[in-house]
Amino acid sequence: EARVVDLCAGSGAIGLAVATETTCTEVWAVEKEAEPFALACQNRDAVGVPCLHLERGDATDPATLAHLDGMVDVVVTNPPYVPADEMPTQPEASADPHVALYGGSPDGTEIPARVARRALTLLRPGGVLLMEHSPSQEEAMVAIAAQLGMTDIATLPDLAGRRRFLSARAPESTKPTASVTQ
């Protein structure tokens, strides 16, 4: 049975997709904000997915899902990552609150770096992190994953060919090798 965690889950769409499209998978989704968390609960209940566990909490807090540390096969995340000077171009982003979009620093990588660090403690050795990011953050996100000691680091394109996804593996020892500072 695979264990998947969706950090910064928002409405729960990614966690729901994983839970409904795969077999023998337990999925945990974490969301900090009240409104999206309530929506994720409604979506889970509407779809009727018993293997999707929702937790309201800070995705970067070591206490959140601490019982899963070192036991997760895949962490997926679409964290707030938009750089401070960048306006989201997707029409659906216009309805999102500021806290769901912007990454907490001028280049937008502060929150993604913290999420990557937390993901590393959740992952089992060899587990995989998949994270959405801005195309402008490709080099920075690769560097962050490398600083954490992750391996098999790659960025993947979206359907338009823009490199927007980080893929990285937890090393055999899942303790971060360096502190990531922004």
Regions found by a protein language model. Name each.
Residues 80-111:
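Mobile active-site "lid"/loop adjacent to the S-adenosyl-L-methionine
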Residues 22, 49, 69, 96, ...:
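Short, well-ordered coil/turn elements that cap or connect secondary structure elements
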Residues 10, 160-161, 173:
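Short strand-connecting beta-turns/loops that link adjacent beta-strands
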Residues 165-182:
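C-terminal lobe and adjacent flexible extensions of AdoMet/dcAdoMet transferase-like proteins
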Residues 1-87, 114:
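Conserved SAM/SAH cofactor-binding pocket of Class I
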Residues 32, 80, 105, 133-135:
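Short strand-turn motif at the edge of the Rossmann-like AdoMet-binding core
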Residues 108-168:
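Conserved Class I SAM-dependent methyltransferase catalytic core
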Residues 7, 104, 157:
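Glycine- and other small-residue-rich loops at beta-strand/loop junctions that grip anionic moieties
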